[in-house]
Amino acid sequence: MPHALEAKYGLTAQELLDAIDKRFRLKVALEGAVAEVHFERKLKVASREGWLAAYEGHDTDGMHDFTVQTLSGATIRVEVKTIRNGSKVQVELQKTRAAKGDPSSRYYDRTHFDLVAVCMGRATGDWSEFRYGLVRELPVHKLYAHKLQVMHAIPDDGNLGPRWFSRFQDAIDAYTA
């Protein structure tokens, strides 16, 4: 039985995959979706194992990707990103476009989300591997103190710059501490 997208577009699954593979921007968008699916898998496991009370995914423009409820009752807003292509392991925290008349609107406000979950798949080939950073520990934009800096290095050594965590549970523990 064909997938709904095959029926909708009149293409085979192979043709759809080939179309994605040939288009850079479409692949970038797909990688973002892949990262979100892998992160949601982690949330499902955390909920099933009993160290996360609940979570909700959001697919709404202008909203963070997930809201997580901890066992202690804390609510954590999570934004999922992928690392940038290139030799440096870093994440870019800015929106695709700025609003007309407000160049600072392209940058994330420090209150937009609490935690960033960065998929490491482009660097490691493992799309289920993440690093987690607390927004309150990330540097601010040099021109707009209420906005986040755009580029953030993710060091291998946790002693460099803001703390980055390789385990989601460690990031939650640090957030609620």
PLM features: what roles do these ranges have?
Residues 1-47, 54:
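Interdomain/boundary linker segments immediately adjacent to catalytic/signaling cores
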Residues 43, 66-68, 74-86:
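Conserved catalytic cores of phosphodiester-cleaving nucleases, focusing on short active-site segments
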Residues 44-50, 71-73, 124:
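Secondary-structure boundary elements
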Residues 48-51, 140-142:
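Structural alpha-beta junctions
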Residues 54-72:
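Active-site metal-binding core of divalent-cation-utilizing nuclease and nuclease-like domains
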Residues 63, 75, 113:
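Extracellular structured ligand-interaction cores
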Residues 80-130:
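Catalytic cores of nucleic-acid endonucleases
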Residues 123, 128, 133-177:
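Non-catalytic C-terminal interaction segments of nucleic acid-processing enzymes
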